[in-house]
């Protein structure tokens, strides 16, 4: 680790001399030995969370499975009624929910209301507004593409997948758990949801919300590793999990065991890239630090590290410090808006990373890390190399490593050498930003901002590769939790028996050559791109001519098939 004038080393960051002792280990042992009433520590002490008895989990699953097979959730009116009850429960328990999140991770109630509670309430309203339209079948003009489907009717119905499990996370314990639950219910599924035991106050408050709803439609399982393990053994039709990649693989294996669908919202190291042609560094600094310090950096789409063009670094760093001061003051530990680390184990992990880095600490505040308060101040680390300890894992902390680059392609190469991130932020002129997006992969990408894309419920949120599988919010949640069921309806009287023999054996022999030729024209006519002549392309371009083009074939088939039909009758 290096130090410079006006910069500090790591030692003032630690207030407790035993900062690196994992005093949380006994708590985890206690969690595993007392399943009925478990004391779980949080930012403001402990909460006694009642875990679901393991022996009850299969019966809870059976109850909601029966609720689905009863067919009540196929009714749009019943779904809407449950969504309204959901909304009623949220509003009745709003204060309890906001208080609970504050007790768990010291997140300001106003912040929780803005980014979590309001998001769920809005999502319910979106589904109540659009459920009728989104549930309508899609109708496709079959005969216009393939003449064999003349007089047929095809539709794609949006049907519920069945019984769904949603496993939430502690860092946004209302939003992350309840947004997918809203989509699953609106799509007609029944749900078992599992709140995070690391946010015990919120887990208990969420369970009170569910009491306003039909228990055959939605239930809650509380618990830790053992309870979750048993829960994942149930034969759910879809598994939805938000959390880290290690547990994500466990959930994926559980889904594979039942050949069920799975959605994984994971994370990764989401970079912010600041290129030399960006127009104004002040909003750049503000938006980066907002995403970095919100919820004390414990956000899956927070800026994990900063890639900045060498020519801008010295100008940007003091602006980053100013942005932190503007949001949380010069003593963020005293700020009502600055969060806390979720538990001692996470606090210790973060402090070990700060000890291991070889970067240079930039003076942001005189506040020191405080284990008893689970507080870590904003930390900016300059001069970080690609192989630094801070670059080995997702930080999930109020730490911003800064890496400089000389060319945009150098920054792109570094992003591509790592796992695909959940989010990618680019601050640059339009052409440069498009160059980055076109040459990288990420779950989402934002130009000239960070984090704010989470507020959009008309676009998909999800990862790619190690950062996740699938997506959700709004219409995309409805699609995730729906099975697209293709239904084809055909008349018995058409086509005529002679023409209908085109698709049936025998196919071989010269006498059946007409079948092969007519069948190809009817079922798989050459698409326009595969036709050679302009004339044939014109006929394909005008869909109705596809139908007219096979009429002579129909007539020929009728004539040639009459003797065959007569012989069969004899």
Question: Where do the language-model regions lie?
Answer:
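N-terminal Rossmann-like NAD(P)+-binding subdomain of aldehyde/semialdehyde dehydrogenases
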Residues: 2-155, 432, 535-539, 550-566
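Conserved C-terminal structural/oligomerization subdomain of aldehyde/semialdehyde dehydrogenase
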Residues: 4, 12, 17, 43-47, ...
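ALDH superfamily catalytic-core signature
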Residues: 48-53, 246-385, 447
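Residue-level signal for inorganic ion chemistry
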Residues: 79, 124, 188, 218, ...
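Structural signal for hydrophobic packing residues in well-ordered secondary-structure cores
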Residues: 87-90, 94, 105, 128-135, ...
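Rossmann-like NAD(P) dinucleotide-binding subdomain of oxidoreductase/dehydrogenase enzymes
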Residues: 145-283, 534-539, 551-563
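Conserved residues at the C-terminal ends of beta-strands
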Residues: 167, 224, 242, 291, ...
